[in-house]
Amino acid sequence: MKKLLIILFTLSFSLLASAQMDSVRHEARYWAERGYFNKSLEALRQLPYDSLTVSDLRLRYDNFANLGNIDSLFYWGDQILKRDPYNIPLILDYTPRLNRGKVSDLGKRVTYPEKVIDICQKYRERDTTHILVNRQLAEAYFNMGNYDLAMPALKKLEAVGDTCFGTLYTLGLTYQRMGDYNSAYDYLSRATVLRNDEHGWCLFNLGIVCNKIGFGAEALSYLEMAKERLMPDRRTLFRMHKELAEAFRMKGENDFRLEELQECMRLADEKDVNELTYEMGQCYFILKQRDKAEELFRKFLDTSENKEYNDKIKSMRESAQQQLRMMMW
């Protein structure tokens, strides 16, 4: 009788614990589905580690993916594959992230091709025909710089009909790295057509290849298109230099501030010129280059005199006039 009671008590406790964990899992999914990824993680942390299912691990992985926490995402991706190395939905999400990598603290992009190769080769023990897995394997070989392995992997993809942009582009880059510029030209040309000449780096590499094989006119065309797509537009560059100038002003580094303002002037619209002229005059005044400061302050006052101006320009005019008077003392 005593043994029976112990068994019943243990069973009741297990059922209660199971029900509680199911409730926690439901809560975690509820929060994740509504975009509350940190709340979902808080719920999952209530589950003992040895009770976590693969689905629990995947929910953690997805939460960290949505939060942009790459290090934690990598950790939970590895935990899932330790339990289930053939988990194809996870592999198809995880390996592209590993191939893209992350930006290190030093600002350099770090990729993990060796890990991708291990994951893909393990999966290929069961299935060697999965195009999406084989793409990531080929990409990993390329990222390692092992073009002798990347090339046959990519050619096998092409042979089974995988002629998407990524495969053609990586084939073109691989031929380029191997010095076969005619083949590189063929594949990069096909790749850029698929992207309607909108992929800047494809155009850039195609321009380089055209130069290598003596197609100067084509090289100019592709490189000009690459420049348009890779360079920020003029107003974006103007804003960037303007913000750099402001940062140098706050640091008190007016020589560098002046350089940035000169870049702004080169990119400026007419409406920006008066304010820039005043700010450059300020820099020269602080740097004790009085002749240049006076010239710019007078120019600013002349060009803004007969125009409608707001409180900011009015304040600048008063400041310029005051600084001119100071220079006369």
Mark where each language-model region is.
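Terminal, low-structured helical/coil segments at or just beyond the last alpha-helical repeat
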Residues: 286, 291-329
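N-terminal leader/linker segments that initiate helical-solenoid repeat arrays
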Residues: 17-75, 82-93, 99-103, 110-111, ...
